[in-house]
A protein has these predicted regions:
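Active-site loop-to-helix "anion-binding N-cap" substructures in soluble metabolic enzymes
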Residues: 1-256
């Protein structure tokens, strides 16, 4: 059975001080829970080092929201995988739709970042998703498999099995709209089937697939109960203690 993973993407929210308060609140609740899921928080880069210190010897791991695929060089403003490993990061989000839209990231860029992440022993959390126009035109599956084809070029089976893929319909990110559990399951199953066609049953059965897109406590249990959904990439709700904890509890419940 695949272990669910709940990851909180704080985006460009929070300071070192406010992030510390959040993590301490999470710790105070989670220390009394027997977890059957992985929990990751992805603060802004300036707050990562403090987050790592606060989560040491706890159930929470720390991720970054993006990275460059170069180790060093004249890339003003970028953060390298070496910098992330130095501060103690274990996970990194790659290819989020906001990075693709606002910063021009392509499937080729995502592919280079995945390779670099694995090279530096970082766990890549790779985002894919369709626009509202693509969904309404019936192109969802074709678009997402196209994204995966580019992102996974020359990635060996052993690494794919360790991937986390997050299905985030662009039309549901930060809009309050959420795919139904049936819609989310349909796409996550298609992702798993595509991995099976590219690799084999072992790789498809091992890869963890999250749903992201306005996940809240009120819809988490239904979504996480679907057979091909192995967790959630949580945005705004990960900045609210009770909301994020309730989503973690939902993951615990379905994996018990």
């Amino acid at each position: 059975m695949r272990k669910p993973i709940i990851a909180g993407n704080w985006k460009m929210n929070g300071t070192i001080a406010s992030g510390s308060i959040l993590i301490e609140a999470f710790n105070s609740v989670l220390q009394d829970m027997e977890l059957s899921c992985d929990v990751v928080v992805c603060p802004p880069f300036t707050a990562i080092e403090r987050a790592v210190a606060l989560t040491r010897n706890t159930a929470i791991e720390v991720g970054a929201q993006t990275m460059d695929y170069h180790d060093a060089g004249a890339f003003t403003g970028e953060i390298s995988p070496l910098m992330l490993t130095e501060v103690g990061v274990n996970y990194v989000i790659i290819g989020h739709s906001e990075r693709r839209e606002y910063y021009g990231e392509t499937d080729e860029t995502v592919n280079a970042k995945i390779k670099s992440a694995f090279h530096h022993n970082l766990n890549p959390l790779v985002c894919v998703g369709e626009s509202l126009e693509q969904r309404e035109a019936g192109h969802t599956i074709d678009w997402i498999t196209s994204q995966l084809k580019g992102a996974l070029a020359d990635i060996p089976k052993e690494q794919v099995s360790q991937l986390i893929i997050a299905y985030e319909p662009i039309w549901a990110i930060g809009t309050g709209k959420t795919a139904t559990a049936e819609q989310a399951e349909e796409v996550c199953k298609a992702i798993r089937d595509y991995i099976r066609s590219l690799y084999d049953d072992d790789a498809a059965d091992a890869v963890r697939i999250q749903y992201g897109g306005s996940v809240k406590s009120e819809n988490a249990l239904e979504i996480l109960g679907e057979p091909n959904i192995d967790g959630a990439l949580v945005g705004g709700a990960s900045l609210v203690v009770d909301e994020f904890i309730d989503i973690i509890k939902a993951a615990n419940q379905v994996s018990a």
